[in-house]
Every structure is written in C-alpha cells, then in structure tokens.
C-alpha cells in the first residue's frame, strides 16, 4: 500500500523553499497523484505549486508592460489557466502613431513612430527620407496649445513633449552655420537656402530692395537654370516669391540680373545666395518676446555669437557668449550673469520678463543649445545624482566642431535631388507678428547693423565665424595704376532710373512736410538710386571665383566707357600698354571682393570713415588714430551723402584707399603704397605690408587721378587725393609730393544744417570744428555700451567744394563710463551760379541723412545763405593786404 507521505513532504518542502528561492520554485516539479478523497490538504497543496510556477513568469512579463494588476491583487485566486497565456505575451504589439512632418519645400512626409519612441527616432527617419547626412544643423518643431514654436527634444519621448492629438511637426534649420561655404554637400546648402528664403518672405530676415533683387536672382538661377529667351518670356518670375511685398519693379530687376548669370550652375547660385544672406543682420537670430526691467517691450535674439537685445527693430545691446557667466530662469523671469569688465570688480545680473514660465524655459533651453553647439568642443554630460540643483537639461547632440569633423569624413557621390519651386510662400509676417509692410529702404539698418557686430565686436565670441571670413580677407591684392576705363561701376544706368529723383523731391518740397519729417523719427524715405548704386557694388561670392560669379562687371565697365566717351577728353598720361592685362585681372579680383564685402557694413559709428564726394575738383584728407577692426573701413562708406546723385551727366571722381597699416613701425618707403597716374610710375604693389582689407574703390569717374599715402610711426594714415579738371594738364613728371587742385569761384552758397540724435541720454562729447566755412551741421549722436574697451577718440573730416555741392563730415567717438558716444556733424554746401531752392535742398539733405542713419533721430535743421564778394571786392583785398 502506497502512502502519499513522499509527495506531501516534497510539496511542503517546495513551499518552504519558495519564499527563499523564487526562481527555483518555478523549476520544482511535483508528481501527479490521484485526487485523494481522504486528503483535502493534498488537493489544496497541489494548487500552490502550479501557482508558484506561473507567478514569477507573469511578474517578469508584467514588469515590462508596467502593469502590476496581476501581481498585486490575484495572489491566491490565480487559476492554472494563466500559465497557458503567459508565453504568448512575449510577442508584444507596440502602439504606433502617425507623424506628419512639413518639409522645407512645403511637401509633407508621413511616417509611423512608436508612441513611446524618442524624438531622435522621428528625426532620423526624416533625414533618411531627405537623404541628408549633415543633419546636426536641423531640427523638428511643433506648436503647443499657445501656438508657440517648440523644439522637439531628441532625447525624450515624443508623447511626453507634444500634448495635442495630431502629431504635426516642421523640419527647419535650428543652427544657422556662420559660414555656409564650409558645408560639405550641396543638398545641405539647398535646404539651408530654402529655410532662408522662407525667413525672407515671412519677414524674419529683413533686407533691402537691392538685396531682395540679388538673392531672388540667385534663387531663380538655381531653380530655372540659365535664361532662355524662348522659354522665359514675359514676366516668368511672377509666380515665384522673393519678398514680403513683391512688386513688379522687383521682378523686373530680378529678371535683369538673371539674364547675366549664364553658365552658373545651381550649386554655384546657391553658394552666392548663402554668401550674401549670411551677412544680413538678422541671419540666424531666434527672436523671443520679452520686457526689460522698465516694462518696455523688447525682443531677445539668440544667435551663434551670443544674446542680442532689440527694441523697435533696432539692436540696442549685445552680450557675447564669453561675457555671459550664467543663464537661468525663475518662473517667468530670465536672468543672465555678466562677467565683470576691465574696470569692474563685481559681476552683474540682468533680468528680463517673459510672457510666462514656459516662454522663459524655452528661451533658456535655446540659449543652452546655441552656446553648446557653437562654443563647446563636445557637449556637457547631464548632471548625475538623485538630488541635483537646477535643471538636468543639456544639449545632447553634436557640436559644430564635431559636425565639421564628421562632415569631412563623408565619402559618397553627390546625391541627386530636384530643386523645388518657391511658390508656396504667400504669407508676409513681421518679427513681432504684425503685418510686414514697410518700405524696402527701412531695413537698410538691418542689412548693415547687427550683423557686423556679430562678427567684429568680439573676436573671442565670433572666433569660428571670423576665422573663415578672415581667410577671405587675407586674399593678396595689388594696387595698380587706375585708369578711368577700369573704374568698377558707373554712377547710373539709364534703364534703372524708373523713378527719377524729381518725383521724390516733389514730395519733400513743402515746409509742413519737413516739419512732419522732423517730428516722426521713424519715418523712412525710399531712395531707389542709392539702392541701385549699392547693388552694383554687391556681390558675387569669393567662394566661386569663376567669371560666372561676376556677371555685372562687363556691363558696368561697358556703361562706364559709354558715359566717358560722350565727353571730349583732353590728353592725359597713361600707363604702359603692357601692364593693362595684369591690371585688369587684379582690378577685377579686387572688385569682386569689394562688392562681396559691401553687405558686411556695420551701422555704427567707428574710428574711421570714407569720404564720398561728388565733384570735379576735390581734396580729401583723412586721419586714422588708433587700431580698428577689419570692417571699420566700411562703416561710413554708405553713410556720407551724394546730393547731386540725380545729375547723371555730371563728372565725378574716384577715390582709391588702401588700408595697409604697420602699427608702431614706419614704412620703409613712404611711397610704396601710393599710386599716381603718370607715365613715369609703373604698377605699385604692397606685398610686404599686412592687408587688413583689400582696396576700397568708390564708384566714380575721373579724368586723372593722383593719390599719395604715408604711413607714420604713430599708426596714423594720411591720404590726400587730388583730382584734376578736364581742362587742366597734368605734368607727367610731377613728384608725389605735389598736388594739383583746380578751384572754381563760387557765387552763391546754399548751406543746409541738419542735426540727428539717437541716445539714451544727452552725450557730453562735442565734435571739434573743422576749419572751413562755418555753414553746416548734420549732427548724429549714438550711445551704446562698450565693455572692456579703451577710451578711443576718432576724428574725421573731409571737405570738398564743387560747382554743385560740398560736404564736410566730422565724427567724434568717445568712450566714457562704459558707454560709447558718437557724434556726427555734417556740413553740406551747395554752390551754383543760380539761386538754389532752399526747400528742395533741405528736403534732400534730411532724406539723405535719414537714409544713411535710419537708427538716428533728426533733431535740428538749419538753412542759411552766404554770398561771395563781387570780383571787384576780391581784387581789392589782395591789393590792401
């Protein structure tokens, strides 16, 4: 007779071992015995081993699913049938969600992503669909309930970031490369071009009429290819979008430029597009609404070089990354801690008020990401530990340095892709969300101002960008003899003068209009002729030095020859014929660079200016004191008036300036950098002298040119330029020290005095008076903080008298108490045989001043008349003396 003690003892033993060894309990097997009617305990005990067998397997699966209901509540009531379902739960079906991503060409890409997937999974799918390898510059955005743009964090689950039911995203550029030419693949530059075109059309990247036309022409060349007279008939660009307020005039200008780009490949056109777009002031600036400590509405812009502060579309302050010690936010406040300056002992903290807590956190994240991407070699690891002060958020992607290293390893044939149309851009929005409907010339300050500061003000913060650009600046240039036929650009082309100056002057004629202009500092006037002038100095990019990149030079030189051949020229000294070929090549190379650099002008008062006068006889003398940055020479090249620009038939002169400075060391040959248009002097070059910037050529025509340059030990550069009248002969053997100045007696002198001021508080620095007629004053004051810079006072004066106009400009810059005060004083003397219309002259002077300094305020305008003595009185004075 068999007993069941054996099985019972085994079951009891298994029950005792089960709590101590749960894994072993699942492996315990008990023999199957017939149901013992006299032993109910055996039946009850038989259930427990099967229960112990199934529970560990169920719990391990349930832990993966994060579903603890089975393990918690059904310990004693679990049925043996559960053991049959547990193996099937291993093949779990994950829920997926459909994501819709709007690409840069307005097409949509749909894909399925696991609901618990991270943002990096979706981003990789999109980049794989686009065949994009240099993907670190891009990102995905989504809109929250407040319609605010948020960046999708690739390290977090998508479900935890986006709250709305439809998963809609947009593929955009997150980090704008400071030098797009360093991108390896054309497809990456193509998507960057699409992003910039969207920024321009929506108003996030403001630019002038000329820049709209230039960038639009490159976009047309990239999309449509070479101009074909049979295929491209009528207004073939009307369906494309180039500007927020696109006009027929802009489209005609784009078509004119497009016709000159024959032979330029789409890739080259995109490189030219990027080389010009990167110089715009708002390039790569991510704007956020905020208020300052006084409750004034401002915009905080985050870019590659630091944090920018804007008010009324003008940049009022800048904090470079090296000067920022700490970035933080608390509730809806955003704080930055500034490194103490040279004369400061303590750190300072600046706070800004944002609309809400989420906005402050969003801005803080953007700052962290931009600083890490552009400034660090590798990203910082997030802090570890249970208790961590502050946020654990850190940028998790690759930095720019790592991206460039990875891009250098790309080894694949250039991917084929089709460039799509830009017809999708139909909206026009401004920076602050309002309708974007300002004149083209209003954005000139954006075209010139903050961008130059981003590159030049802080060498440490803009190191990565400046290295690439200085590589272009260091291109060796030679100073050759300059002949009138080799001048870079004509003053005007007749076909461009769709709007004559007379139309603009009629609107300025009345005194009431002048008063209203003085009372409205933000009103801007359109001056198309200045735009045409600037546009002919614009670019082809130096990144592609092929002749295709400079399509306008041939037309410009042809127009110059046509204009000069209409007049009867007296004999003048010429250079030897053997040098003309080399001179033409060097002059073209210099001109290419000068045109390209024209967009990089900063709208700020700096230590050196360039005179641009309209005259037959002129003498220009300027002095540079102290050291200055590479782009300082261009700061006022667009800022000095040319009041008789509307007289297209007037003779003008060319001024050629070279910035070859040896700080602290005199030049071995005082005349080594000078040039003189005489047969005895050949081509002069300065190969041994450091070229801070290539030759700056103003667009003028002269019959003869004499230039002398001296470099003095105190780093003082003095250049005197003398232009001869057409009726006067120049002695070919004249030494460099001689000057020829032909003057014409003036009869009536009309003087316009204009004062402009833009400062937070009245400045204390006063401009020294320049010897000459006490007739004028265009006075400009600009107050901006400068940290860690020495006190610098720079003065510039230029006087030119002609039959038409004479302009004197005086600039004094003083740094005091951490603030820079700049005062600009201009005298405009209009001389003529007949009476000058005071209203028209004053209107033109005010308009010119506001166009040149749109960020300044005109506060005073004075007009008075001077009459020269009669010829008899002039004869008596020498006799009496």
Swiss-Prot record:
Protein name: Band 4.1-like protein 1
Subunit architecture: Interacts with AGAP2.
GO BP term (any one): cortical actin cytoskeleton organization
Entry's localization field: Cytoplasm, Cytoskeleton
UniProt-listed Pfam families: 4_1_CTD, FA, FERM_C, FERM_M, FERM_N, SAB
Biased composition (Low complexity): 17-35
Region spans: Disordered: 1-88, 428-501, 514-596, 642-699
Major localization listed first in the record, in broad terms: cytoplasm
